[in-house]
C-alpha cells in the first residue's frame, strides 16, 4: 500500500482508496516496510517519504521475531506457500504486536490462514 501511496504514477482511484488508511491516527509502520520502501525509492523521493514516516510510530523488530518469522516461513513452505523473507518479517511483526496488516498483497491472506496474522486485503481500485 505504501508503494502505491508514494509512487507518482499510481492511478488517482488507488491513491484515493488508500489515503484514508495511511492518514489514520492509529497507523503504525514496521521496520521491514520502511526498509523495503526506502531501498527502492528514487533519490528525489526519499526525503519526502522519510518526512512522512517520521510522523508515524515504527514497530521495532525484536530478535525473537526473526526466529518466529523463520518458523512461519517453514510452516508456509510445508503448506506449499512460498513467501519472501521481508513479507514473513512484516507478517510476524504484525502478529507480535497484535497489529492488523492492511495491504493489496493477496499472499498475506495465505499467511493469515497459517498463522495468527490479522490481514485486511483490499481490492485494488480501478
Model-derived features: positions:
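Short, well-structured N-terminal submotif of metal-dependent ribonuclease cores
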Residues: 1-29, 38-51, 125-126
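A generic structural signal for short hydrophobic patches within well-formed alpha-helices
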Residues: 2, 34-37, 108-109
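Active-site neighborhoods of divalent-metal-dependent phosphate/nucleic-acid chemistry enzymes
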Residues: 5, 16, 57-106
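General small-molecule cofactor/ligand-binding pocket signal
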Residues: 28, 59, 120
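A secondary-structure boundary/capping signal
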Residues: 30-33, 104
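A beta-strand edge to alpha-helix "cap/lid" segment located at domain peripheries
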Residues: 79, 110-113
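Hydrophobic beta-strand scaffold residues
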Residues: 101, 116-119
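Short, C-terminally biased terminal segments at protein or domain edges
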Residues: 118-126
